[in-house]
Amino acid sequence: DVYKRQNAALPTRGGTQLWADEHIRDGWRIQRHVWSGHFRLLDDHNVRHAWGSYPDCLLELNRRKVAASQNRHLVLLVHGIGRGPATFGDLPDKLREAGFEARAISYPSTRGSIEDHAAQLERLLQRAEGVDEVSFVTHSMGGIIVRRLLGGNSVWQSRIKPGRLIMIAPPNQGSIVAETLQPAWPYRLVYGTAGQQLTPAKVTALPVPAIPFGIIAGGLGDTEGFNPLVPGDDDGTVSVAETRLEGAADFMILPGLHGFVARSPEIVLPVLNFLRSGRFEKVRRHPNG
């Protein structure tokens, strides 16, 4: 019985590399542990209120009368490899203030393949309540996962309209860093299967999203960038050239390093503009994304 197993409210760190969000409702999350397969229920402050099976946690969520948001446009923020929801700083809060039901999700990015992570997003969307439309804001590998998600025949798309996609610092052409390091066992150990899938040959095989998408690259706006080992302008990890993808509705370069560009205060307005209109607007644009 869930009520017997339920502990007193227990603070957690929210889960990054060992927990996967499987159900979200108004900031509450049911998460699955990547190794044990058991579930837990966290509130919007990452306090655990129940654990056990998925039905156990859903029962407790319903018992607490946590209502689905009245905003029917969900925006999922999907972080990159080795990172977590904090990647986006206060961007989710800013999007909620602007009227979107924005949620930065957790997934075990170094424990599984890109296909595994896309399947997690698919389950999450299949369970989404009161949602008519979903858009995505991604960082780094998060964009590759969403491309994989959108390239499949997903059941959720029969009732939820895919909206727009903003990819921040995505390795859309694969990553020369990943290709160089992929044979080394320390890289394989740290970044797992997904890290080995970020090579140009594997990433470029993914279909181009069939929804409006925009790309925000990090860089210096010059020919050298931050990292002398990455050709051309770059954010220290991904080159501007690697972020590009034919068919982009808009493209911009934002000064910043790879790990920090998604939390830059300067990114809020372009993201909001694109979610609303499909253009970054009033920012320095580069054609032919």
Task: Place the predicted regions along the sequence by residue.
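Flexible, membrane-associating and regulatory peripheral segments of lipid-active enzymes
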Residues: D1-V75, G84-G89, D93-R103, A119, ...
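Serine-dependent carboxylesterase/thioesterase catalytic core
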Residues: L76-I81, R96, E101-I211, D235
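Short, solvent-exposed loop/turn segments at secondary-structure junctions
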Residues: G82-R83, T110, N172-Q173, G219-T223, ...
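Generic hydrophobic alpha-helical membrane-span motif
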Residues: P85, V146-R148, S175, A241, ...
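Short, contiguous clusters of charged residues that form electrostatic/catalytic patches at enzyme active sites
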Residues: A86, D116-A119, R123, E266-L269, ...
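Residues that form or flank phosphate/diphosphate-binding pockets in enzymes
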Residues: A86, G112, A262
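Short aromatic-enriched loop/helix-cap "lid" or pocket-rim segments at secondary-structure transitions
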Residues: G89, D116, S175-L181, E224-L229, ...
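C-terminal catalytic-base region of ester-bond hydrolases, centering on the histidine
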Residues: P209-G289
